[in-house]
């Protein structure tokens, strides 16, 4: 009789939740069920109540997310007087020994019901209740990941700040007035040692092929060396002059004489000195003819073993000297 009632109960209510079945097994001790003559009636009432509760749980889970703590709270609120309440409730095979004989005929149906409930829960999106230990592990991993992320961000900001501070320090060193003054003095001394004028430096800057930098005037180089340029112009001109100075010193050490680094023009010719015998011969020719022709100048230069241009310049200078002497004698 009792077995038939149980079978009718399971067939009428296929959506019974496994936790309700386990709760009923734990909360009702086996001796009371075996010794009670109304056990079939009691079990039928309990089955109907459990079926309503299971239907309510399933219908509620379709519209709301499944909350494990609510189910655990409901189960813990039921007063359990059996000493075997420590047995896991959710496991269908963990039945008490006293219940084995009573529920032996329900094992096949119970497995089918569990499969049906599991499939219905998976369709509704709830699935099996998550394990609290798994949830705790996932939450812990999430917090660790967020912690590493925040730590990386916190480490990134000081790094950015340190790079910014490093660039600021470099700019401060370059814009230091004392550093600019020391470089200007050093540049002046080394330029003089190389034998290059300020005008030569200004014109040679165009040969460096630096983008945006052309030749500069002699006054600009002079004002740089005397620190009379504006502070911003001093900062802008310093790397250009430093690049020129490095190349000029390298060329000076190698002694290969790069003319474009200095002026690009010919060096000043040395003053020609004429020996006394050649000088007396030129004076004699000048007394005869102060304005010789080009052919006569070439013949004199060949005779005295001098350059034609030297002879021509000497005659020109001698005429200018005679004019000055006549002018001073009249006045």
From Swiss-Prot:
The protein's predominant localisation is nucleus
Localization terms from the record = Nucleus; Cytoplasm
Q: Which GO terms describe its molecular function?
A: DNA-binding transcription factor activity, RNA polymerase II-specific; RNA polymerase II cis-regulatory region sequence-specific DNA binding; sequence-specific DNA binding
Q: Which keywords does this Swiss-Prot/TrEMBL entry list?
A: Activator, Cytoplasm, Differentiation, DNA-binding, Homeobox, Nucleus, Transcription, Transcription regulation
CDD domains, A to Z: homeodomain
- Which tissues is this chain's protein expressed in? Expressed in the nervous system. Expressed in the otic vesicle during embryogenesis. Expressed in the adult retina in a subset of retinal ganglion cells (RGCs), and at a lower level in the adult tectum. Not expressed in the adult olfactory bulb.
Q: Low complexity bias located where?
A: 81-97
Q: Which residues form the POU-specific domain?
A: 172-249
| Keyword Transcription regulation set for record | yes
Q: How does it assemble?
A: Interaction with ISL1.
Known role: Acts as a transcriptional activator. Acts by binding to sequences related to the consensus octamer motif 5'-ATGCAAAT-3' in the regulatory regions of its target genes. May play a role in specifying terminally differentiated neuronal phenotypes.
This protein's name: POU domain, class 4, transcription factor 3
Instruction: Name its species.
Output: Danio rerio (Zebrafish)
């Amino acid at each position: 009789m009792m077995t038939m009632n149980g079978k009718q109960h399971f067939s009428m209510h296929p959506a019974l939740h496994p936790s309700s079945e386990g709760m009923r097994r734990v909360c009702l001790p086996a001796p009371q069920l075996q010794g009670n003559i109304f056990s079939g009636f009691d079990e039928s009432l309990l089955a109907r109540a459990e079926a309503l509760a299971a239907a309510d749980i399933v219908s509620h889970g379709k519209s709301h997310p499944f909350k494990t703590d609510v189910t655990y709270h409901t189960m813990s609120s039921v007063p359990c007087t059996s000493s075997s309440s420590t047995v896991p409730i959710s496991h269908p095979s963990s039945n008490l020994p006293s219940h084995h004989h009573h529920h032996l005929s329900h094992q096949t149906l119970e497995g089918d019901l569990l499969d049906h409930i599991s499939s219905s829960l998976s369709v509704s999106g709830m699935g099996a209740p998550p394990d609290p230990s798994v949830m705790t592990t996932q939450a812990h991993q999430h917090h660790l990941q967020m912690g590493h992320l925040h730590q990386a961000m916190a480490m990134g900001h000081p790094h950015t700040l340190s790079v910014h501070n490093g660039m600021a320090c470099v700019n401060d060193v370059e814009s230091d007035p004392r550093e600019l003054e020391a470089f200007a003095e050093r540049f002046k001394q080394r330029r003089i040692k190389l034998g290059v004028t300020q005008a030569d430096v200004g014109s040679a800057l165009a040969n460096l092929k630096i983008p945006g930098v052309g030749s500069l005037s002699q006054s600009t180089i002079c004002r740089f060396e005397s620190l009379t340029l504006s502070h911003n112009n001093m900062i802008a001109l310093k790397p250009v002059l430093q690049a020129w100075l490095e190349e000029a010193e390298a060329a000076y050490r190698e002694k290969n004489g790069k003319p474009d680094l200095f002026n690009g023009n010919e060096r000043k010719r040395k003053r020609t000195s004429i020996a006394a015998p050649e000088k007396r011969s030129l004076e004699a020719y000048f007394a005869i003819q102060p304005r010789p022709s080009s052919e006569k100048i070439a013949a004199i230069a060949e005779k005295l073993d001098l350059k034609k241009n030297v002879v021509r310049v000497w005659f020109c200078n001698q005429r200018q000297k005679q004019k000055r002497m006549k002018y001073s004698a009249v006045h």
